[in-house]
Amino acid sequence: MFSGAVLYSEKLQLPGIEIMKPIFLAVFCILVPVSCTPSAGISVPNLSTPSSLEESQILFDDFSYSTIDEMTYNGWVVRSGSGWPGVTGATFRPENVSFLDYPDPADNRLLRMTSSTDGTAENTYQTQICHQRKYMEGTYAARVRFSDQPVSGVDGDQVVQTFYTITPYIEPLAPDYSELDYEYLPNGGWGSGDLTFYVTTWETVQIEPRNADNTSSSVQGSLAGWHTLVTQVTGGTVRYFVDGQLIAQHGGEYYPDAPMSINFNLWFIDGGLVQVEGLREYQEDIDWVFHQAGIALMPEEVEAAVARMRRQSIKFRDTVPAKVPALVSPCNF
C-alpha cells in the first residue's frame, strides 16, 4: 500500500531489462518498499577524484580468505541467531559462509553465502555478514553474482539477495535511521512479480506494526549472473548504478542521516516459502566490496581502483577511521 499518484512513466533500458521510472509520485510508503520512485531528472554529478588511493579513506576487500576467523580479523561479523529480517523462527548460521577459488581474474577467491529451507521455519537457515558502522557519504560498490533458481531443490521460495548499508534499528520511526538497499527477488515478493530488482532509500521504519517511510525504484527482468553495483552518496543525492548504468536517483528527506555499516545478506520473505517437501539451497557470491569516503566515483573509476589494487596484490585495505567514540555495530538487521 502507498499514498500518492503516478502522472506518467517512462522506460529506461538495461540489456534485456525494462525499468519503469514514474515521473511524479508522492514519496511516503507504507508496509512494503515497492511503490515509491525517484524524482524526475536523473543526473550525474561533477566528480572530484583524489590524486592517489593512498591519500583516500578507502575500504576494499577482495574476500581472499580461507576461514571466517581471517574475515572477522578484518572487521567483519558473520551473523548467528535469529531475528529480522526473514522467516519468523529461522536461524542465521555462520557456517553458511564459505570461500572458494574463482579464476576471473586468475588466482581470485570469492565469498559465497548459501541459505536453505525445506518450507518450515525450524529448517530455514539464512546468511548475513556486516562490516563496522563508520560509513556515510562517498561511494559504495560491490561485485556480486545473483541467481534465478536454487542450486538444488524445487524453485519458488521468495528469496532476497542483497547488498546494503544500514544503521541499527534502535526504536520505531527513529529520526536518524538510514538504509540504502539493493535487493534482487527472483521469485517475487512484497506484491511484485518474479525477477524484480529493488533499489530503496529509507528515511525511517517501524517493524511492528509495519510502517516503512522510503523511496524505491524497481527493475524488471533477470539479473542472474555477475553485476557491479555502485552507489554514490554525496550532496544530498543518492545515485544507484548497475553495470555502469544509472538506474535511480533519490534524495530529499531520504538522504542518509547517520553513519552506516556495510552488509550483505541472503534471506527468505516471511510467508513466502513454498509448502512442498524437500530441501532447497540458494546462493549469492561476492567478489569484492569497495568504499571511497566523501567522493562520488563513477563506476568506471571504481573498476579502475579495484583493478589497480589487484595489480598491487592488495587483498584488503581499510583506511576509513572509526568514529570516536566507536559506534555500536550490531549485525542483527
Sequence positions of predicted segments:
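Short, Lys/Arg-enriched N-terminal segments with co-localized hydrophobic residues
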Residues: 2-19
